[in-house]
């Protein structure tokens, strides 16, 4: 596992998209409830955001395997882990790369004790969202 440090989560997201090779015209799946900086990172690459709905527990309602995205963002809202089973199933079906956005979950773990932000192809965790740090 390689760990890189960035001053802001948006810079980490940009780097993840760069390493994945997200470019003009590529599809990136995002939850309909998302930070504008994540959306900006998609738009900066010239990629097309595709939104999936989340339920009242902020879990994905439906990930359409017919929509072939280059990357899919799984957000651990407020440090609560996403159930990655649906994301992994989707990624296997179309070759998509999962980015785990754990900006609000510093040191949070899932029910198996795994650190959030380290369970997928790419993970992003932010000190700034949990511990006030300057820009």
Predicted feature descriptions by range:
Residues 18-107:
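PLP-dependent aminotransferase-like
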Residues 1-16, 30-31, 52-53:
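Short loop-beta-helix segment that forms the pyridoxal 5′-phosphate
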């Amino acid at each position: 596992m390689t760990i890189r440090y960035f001053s802001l989560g948006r810079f980490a997201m940009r780097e993840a998209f760069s390493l994945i090779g997200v470019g003009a015209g590529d599809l990136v799946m995002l939850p309909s409830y998302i930070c504008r900086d994540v959306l900006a990172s998609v738009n900066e690459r010239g990629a097309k955001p595709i939104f999936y709905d989340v339920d009242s527990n902020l879990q994905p309602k439906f990930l359409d395997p017919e929509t072939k995205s280059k990357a899919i963002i799984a957000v651990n809202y407020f440090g609560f882990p996403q159930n990655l089973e649906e994301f992994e199933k989707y990624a296997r079906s179309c070759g998509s790369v999962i980015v785990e956005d754990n900006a609000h979950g510093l040191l949070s773990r899932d029910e198996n004790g795994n650190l959030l932000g380290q369970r997928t192809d790419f993970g992003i965790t932010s000190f700034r969202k949990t511990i006030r740090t300057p820009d």
